[in-house]
Amino acid sequence: MYQKDILVSILINNYNNESFIKKCVQSCLNQSYKNIEIIIFDDVSFDKSKKYIKSIKNEKVKKIFNKKKYFKSGRLNQLNAIKRSFLKSKGEIIFLLDSDDAFLKNKVKYFVNTFKKNKKLEFLQDNPIYHYPNTNFKEKKILKSKKLVFHTWPYFNPTSTMAFQRHFFDKFLKEISFSNKKFGTMAIDARAIIYIYFFSKNFKILNKYLTIYTQNVRGYTISEYNNKGAAWWKRRLEFHNFVQSLFFKKKKTYYKSLDYYLTYIMNMIYKN
């Protein structure tokens, strides 16, 4: 049962985002919903973002400073950061937030009220407002639908749009623990949406735009997802291998789709 004002945990992972981290943190502190804690994980930054995080004097903010990276893959380091931040958190609802993104003022309040109205909900996601910092242009985008006879999983929104019931997030992290050191091209948003799509019946994508999603040229948001070349097909095969491993872990039968065979063939073509 939820208490009147349940505690919310916002998990922020940061690596060298000095241009965005202050706006990110302030967007959390300025939330209209006040019963929050903010866990900031700095992953060995060497720019001014680390200094800013150290300077924050607010009882709502808890800080973790990683001393060394464990993986060459940024996605695996992100997963490690979120796992360690979650262990430090106490909230009943867990929000994920990349340090180059931000929340609109009423996001947490809207999500909490939605969870309260439907206590069976395990996962919520809103739509992102794409922000292009070089021009300060912003645009709203909505998820496209897929014909799933040709696709194994649906389109999904980025990490910073995601929120989980604590018990469900804990279960998710435990059940994908086989992948903690594998599938280096997969960010946590891909792992989460695949897990949720196949193994949760209680999730919802809100028709709301409550997250600023920064198209950071330093990050993964622009270059890697639009070019459907060899790297794109290789990453897609890794996603399929993750799905198979997840089904094996869950002791469920997995049937390969047309999408899998097309992806496999394209990898063979590029390999040759």
Q: Can you describe what each PLM-predicted range is?
A:
Residues 26-35:
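Short, acidic, metal-binding catalytic loop of nucleotide-sugar glycosyltransferases
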Residues 66-86, 108-174, 240-244:
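Flexible acidic/His/Gly-enriched loops in nucleotide-sugar-dependent glycosyltransferase catalytic domains
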Residues 94:
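Short aromatic/hydrophobic "clamp" motif used to bind/position activated sugar donors
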